[in-house]
Amino acid sequence: MNGPHDLGGMMGFGAIAPEANEPLFHAPWEKRAMAISLAMGATRQWNIDMSRHAREKIPPGDYWSLSYYEIWIEGLLRLMNERHMLDGPPKALPRLEAQNVTPVLAKGSAYNRDVAPAPQFKIGDRVRVRNLQPTGHT
């Protein structure tokens, strides 16, 4: 998938100039956006890959006009809409109780996956690559 979220693979944008002493949050609402995203993740209605894909599906014109945390909220809204969580009566979902937030975040979550076949190449092998521009998720 080649889109605005893939700046590392897009031509013509130049180097990213990091903001000196950039704060983690530029405004109070950004803290809440992050907290809501984490809280909704605790409902176990999607995984980290589904969450990332929801953000990657944002149309480029919309994506370019959104800030970092607006992108997270837009992705969250997409996930919730896909699961009909915003219409009809509230559904009973798993919750993360306040006293458990810090230990759960400190523990993190699994992101490793077993790889069934052995890798085809090893470090130092010469390979030939193609510049593909896939339209879907890779």
Regions found by a protein language model. Give the residues of each.
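N-terminal intrinsically disordered, low-complexity, charge/repeat-rich segments that act as generic
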Residues: 1-96
